[in-house]
């Protein structure tokens, strides 16, 4: 049995980040970076890179590995998880020369130059090897997150919400080992 627990923190200064096309559209839907056809339909958004003044990230990694060899074959199980507790990025406030740090964890982040950041990601792997056969089950869990963008009443009347639900995926596999001559 092998168990590891790692707390980590990363503080970036002037991290190179790519602009989000959605943020550019939100800030100025008809700006110079936006290309539209003669009907006003969106064709392209030109993005570039910039230095984000700072980014602060904090989390916890957990891993458990178990291996057991028996007369019925070899069994192995592992589980690996990452909990993201902070992903702080600057957000400029109107008229303020200083930016405030906003925690992006658990959010869709349509308004930031980053992506959706679920709080928890978990992967587990179970395998049984006997003779030249390996049977495996892999499972992946991804935490849900919220979208803080408002949703029109026409969408909410159809049951849509601002929550992206968590999901769990299972993969099953069978592998046969053989030697080529």
Could you describe each region identified by the protein language model?
Residues 32, 40-50, 99-112, 116-118, ...:
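Extracytoplasmic loops and strand-loop junctions of Gram-negative outer membrane beta-barrel proteins
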Residues 64, 84-88, 93-110, 162-163:
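Short, solvent-exposed micro-motifs at the edges of structured domains
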Residues 4-76:
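Outer membrane beta-barrel strand-and-loop segments of large Gram-negative receptors
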Residues 11, 85-87, 143-145:
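Feature marks short, surface-exposed loop/turn motifs that line or immediately flank catalytic pockets
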Residues 33-39, 81, 94-98, 138-141:
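A glycine-rich, aromatic-flanked flexible loop/lid motif
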Residues 60, 65, 73-82, 111-181:
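Conserved C-terminal beta-signal and adjacent last beta-strands/turns
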Residues 15-22, 88-98, 146-156:
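Outer-membrane beta-barrel translocator domains and adjoining extracellular loop/strand segments
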